[in-house]
Amino acid sequence: MEEDRVLSSVHSTVFKESESLEGKCDKIEGYDFNQGVNYPKLLRSMLTTGFQASNLGDVIDVVNQMLEWRLSDETIAPEDCSEEEKDPAYRESVKCKIFLGFTSNLVSSGVRETIRYLVQHHMVDVIVTTTGGVEEDLIKCLAPTFKGDFSLPGAYLRSKGLNRIGNLLVPNDNYCKFEDWIIPIFDQMLKEQKEESVLWTPSKLLARLGKEINNESSYLYWAYKMNIPVFCRGLTDGSLGDMLYFHSFRTSGLVIDVVQDIRAMNGEAVHATPRKTGMIILGGGLPKHHICNANMMRNGADYAVFINTGQEFDGSDSGARPDEAVSWGKIRGSAKTVKVYCDATIAFPLLVAETFASKREQSCEHKT
């Protein structure tokens, strides 16, 4: 009798009755290759694959929500709307304002071409990057970056004048070509500052470099052409900073005003209303925080997508999940957010394929 009681207790513990999840959660099911190779369906199946594949599927959903949102989706509040904002045609034309941030290593990689595609077709509204994210774009117009290996010895590469970025190799000659190209531009900027009272800011400098490079492979060129602002808070950290340093010895006096740029950057968020704002941030560091901080000025972004491999246990901003930014007012509590823990060189091209690129293809097909 006692044994039966114990067995019954153990049985009820092991086989505890479950709450039904039917209709509440997606069933986990991967792509069936018996259907043939269909890449759009494969990408859509990520949502129900599990782990970071599901997070990638969620990222795709959130970005598509950014792209599909229109002011006409919102209820009109007459007391808060201008006459223009009450017009149905105007409301249908107002889209989400998208901030794109990325670190320099992604421009060193082939993700540069994905970024260039977005900028070329004016699919994003504001860009924030690091100095490396600027100079690597320009340098690639002058000379290529090559595939190497993560394990190549640093001392050996140094003896050959080769710089390693992960498993990429950048010959030091590339930076020599960069110096030859950019110093005359600094000279001309200084002349315009003195003779025409031009007030240079980091974003004005980057627009000028985009104009001067005049190369369609460059995202900076397309940002200049499309009048998309590119902000770089840490302008002097990198080869571009080295060039400014060397130039200051040749002829002093070139001034670049960062205060005007913080007003401009924060203004992009503050004056976005009545638009919603969305953040797509690849990697962490300065671009991630600069975009989030600007959106704090408007009580937070409405959509946020983070793609990086950073962890939050060390308290770094780079590794923080979107929910931490909610606590600061940088992302709204009601926002659609997701972070995918993945190398952005893998995740971002797949994301663009199933969002920006597919929607552009559909739009082109509809027009024809």
From Swiss-Prot:
Family: Belongs to the deoxyhypusine synthase family.
NCBIfam families documented for this protein: dhys
Pfam family name, one: DS
Active site feature: K330 (nucleophile)
One function term, GO molecular function aspect: deoxyhypusine synthase activity
Its biological purpose: Catalyzes the NAD-dependent oxidative cleavage of spermidine and the subsequent transfer of the butylamine moiety of spermidine to the epsilon-amino group of a specific lysine residue of the eIF-5A precursor protein to form the intermediate deoxyhypusine residue. Also able to produce homospermidine from putrescine.
The EC number(s) this enzyme carries: 2.5.1.46
Entry cofactors: NAD(+)
PANTHER family in the record: DEOXYHYPUSINE SYNTHASE (PTHR11703:SF0)
Reactions catalysed according to its record: [eIF5A protein]-L-lysine + spermidine = [eIF5A protein]-deoxyhypusine + propane-1,3-diamine
Pathway recorded for this protein: Protein modification; eIF5A hypusination
Keyword vocabulary terms for this entry: Hypusine biosynthesis, NAD, Transferase
InterPro entries cross-referenced by the UniProt entry: Deoxyhypusine_synthase, Deoxyhypusine_synthase_sf, DHS-like_NAD/FAD-binding_dom
Annotated residues for binding of spermidine: E135, E136, D242, H289, G315, S316, D317, E324, A325, V326, S327, W328, G329, K330
Annotated residues for binding of NAD(+): 104-108, 130-132, 136, 237, 284, 309-310, 343-344
Name the UniProt record assigns to this protein: Deoxyhypusine synthase
